[in-house]
Regions:
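Catalytic-site microenvironment of enzymes
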Residues: 1-251
């Protein structure tokens, strides 16, 4: 009897030892799993940080920043840019004129107390879809795209502003106010307000317009569009039209 009791006790002890060993192994594996997971998470965080840092350093003035979502009252879109020069005449590129006018307009609007975002602040390329998406993410009140015109015969002249029939009804009002205000400032030929279903007008979710500030292919207008004082007049006209628009929707 004593021998059998000893055998049972011995067997029980061996079973307990195996169970303890399994528990220790399980705890060890859980511990190692936690360590490995922590290392992977830390690596991902560090890797992500350097990716964002590299992007920010290589795009210091590119406001198409997917890591910012602060709201803006107004989006100004400087047409073309980077590999897309837009219209070109006598080595003068549309992308340079539109950027200069956009920056001048931005300063005027900010001085009037509005929060303004711009699709580009330097010579960078942005797709049309990116421009529209940026404006939508910013939840802006209005979107104004600034361009220069061209014609094959070089005779085209004047300023015109477009809105889309698929955009909000108030886009027409915005287009008319901006068009009239620019004409008042510049005394340029009034080509009036027209409809056009451009990508940036159709895919934006706020009243949106596109301003053609003059013809680069027209020698006289090309000279004017390259002049800093004339650009200021256009910028003032765009600003005046926007301010009048906001006055009308406040009434």
């Amino acid at each position: 009897m004593q021998k059998n009791h000893y055998q049972r006790t011995s067997n029980l002890t061996n079973t307990q030892k195996r169970r303890k060993k399994k528990r220790r192994r399980r705890k060890f594996l859980q511990f190692m799993g936690t360590i490995i997971l922590s290392v992977l998470i830390l690596t991902a965080v560090i890797f992500g940080y350097f990716i964002i840092r590299h992007y920010r350093e290589s795009h210091p003035d590119d406001l198409l920043d997917h890591f910012r979502f602060n709201r803006a009252d107004i989006i100004l879109d400087a047409g073309h840019g980077g590999k897309d020069p837009g219209a070109v005449a006598n080595d003068i590129s549309e992308k340079d004129i539109t950027l200069s006018i956009s920056l001048k307009t931005k300063d005027l609007l900010e001085n009037a107390g509005y929060k303004v975002a711009i699709t580009r602040k330097e010579d960078t390329f942005l797709s049309l879809d990116d421009r529209a998406s940026y404006a939508n993410r910013k939840k802006a009140n209005i979107f104004v795209s600034i361009h220069c015109n061209s014609s094959e015969d070089g005779e085209g002249k004047g300023i015109e502003t477009f809105y889309s029939e698929y955009n909000e009804e108030s886009a027409k009002n915005l287009a008319e106010l901006i068009q009239n205000s620019i004409i008042e400032q510049t005394a340029a030929k009034d080509r009036e307000v027209k409809t056009a279903n451009y990508t940036v007008l159709v895919r934006t979710k706020m009243p949106s317009v596109l301003v053609e500030t003059g013809f680069l292919t027209n020698e006289t207008e090309r000279s004017l569009l390259s002049d800093d004082d004339y650009q200021k007049k256009i910028a003032q006209g765009i600003t005046d039209g926007i301010l009048k628009y906001f006055d009308t929707i406040k009434e």
